[in-house]
Amino acid sequence: MAEVRVQLLLSRRPESVSFARSVCGLLGAGPGLGTWPIHCSLKRGRLVLSSRPFPGASARLPLQRPPFCPFAALEERPRVPGAELPTDRGVDLGVAVILQSSDKTVLLTRRARTLSVSPNLWVPPGGHVELEEELLDGGLRELWEESGLHLPQGQFSWVPLGLWESAYPPRLSWGLPKYHHIVLYLLVISQESQQQLQARIQPNPNEVSALMWLTPDVAAAVAAAEDGTETPGLLPQDLPPSVLAVELEEDGRARPLVLHMSTLLRMIPTMAEDKERVSTGTKFALKLWLQHLGRTPPPCKSAAYLDPGPAKEEWNMDPLPPNQGSGK
């Protein structure tokens, strides 16, 4: 099916974004790391972004890009012959689900090594949003396609966390970008425990080669290993040397995998390689999840939505507009 494109409200009406332009740059992002608060209209098959409030905006979310964003780098350089990017393509919309268990762990999956885009990376389940598909439905569909998990209606709550400008290859030293997305991270909070969810997981071996559940302390260490920074963040003294994951064998059977912490803390290399690591956007999403753990306002309920009420100063507290999430 056709894919959803991202639109920006830069003047009077929403307009599509050229593939070659940095979304953060067009919205007025400075040279720093961000994040930048962005007003969003999150509707069926459509994502509209603006740096200013506008009629129909239903959320105010943090937007960020990596410090090595290739689109930002290209805009700062003079044009080089042979370095032209497509002019007939836009920026696609992706959605990723940060699935939290009732005992406060989150699910990450390792992308299969055979995938042509971002192989061997640890990421939350996610993918493209299809036309006329609710954003939550798109995230839950991707969760089901990759992990086999179906979340029954009424047994989870959810809230949008933030937006990430993504490119692949992720930096110019790897080559010119071939893919350009804005990824919407959704926090989906299940009423089931990690053990209950794990018992129902049936990973798709064509997309997933391993999976693991992160506790808040491990997630904090992973988020602190920020790509593109000169010095890593301070790590807790009591950080475990490894975490237990589940790996899929070639015949589809699962086996325990002891994953060394150094793998999870690995940063993006300068030159292209497929070493196992946590993706840069995932580190951003984990940081937002950790911030959310300390908040008191309840997230949106599945198939039941909160009244937006008065404008809030904190981003990601405004609920999505009313819709009927199918949970499929």
Curated annotation (Swiss-Prot):
EC number(s) per entry: 3.6.1.62
Positions of transmembrane segments: none
Keywords per UniProt: Hydrolase, Magnesium, Manganese, Metal-binding
Substrates-to-products reaction catalysed: a 5'-end (N(7)-methyl 5'-triphosphoguanosine)-ribonucleoside in mRNA + H2O = N(7)-methyl-GDP + a 5'-end phospho-ribonucleoside in mRNA + 2 H(+)
Class in the EC hierarchy, top level: hydrolase
Gene3D superfamilies the UniProt entry points to: Nucleoside Triphosphate Pyrophosphohydrolase (3.90.79.10)
Cofactor(s), names only, from the UniProt record: Mg(2+); Mn(2+)
Entry-linked Pfam families: NUDIX
Annotated segments matching region Disordered: 299-328
GO biological process: one example: NADH metabolic process
Tagged with keyword rRNA-binding: no
An example Gene Ontology CC term for this record: peroxisome
Motif (Nudix box): 127-148
Domain (Nudix hydrolase): residue spans on this chain: 90-236
Single GO MF annotation: NADH pyrophosphatase activity
Residues engaged in binding Mg(2+): E142, E146
Function: Acts as a decapping enzyme capable of hydrolyzing monomethylated capped RNAs (in vitro). Hydrolyzes monomethylated capped RNA after alpha and beta phosphates to form N(7)-methyl-GDP. Shows low activity towards unmethylated capped RNA.
PANTHER family attached to this UniProt entry: NUCLEOSIDE DIPHOSPHATE-LINKED MOIETY X MOTIF 17, NUDIX HYDROLASE, NUDC SUBFAMILY
Family of the protein in this entry: Belongs to the Nudix hydrolase family.
Full protein name: m7GpppN-mRNA hydrolase NUDT17
Organism: Homo sapiens (Human)
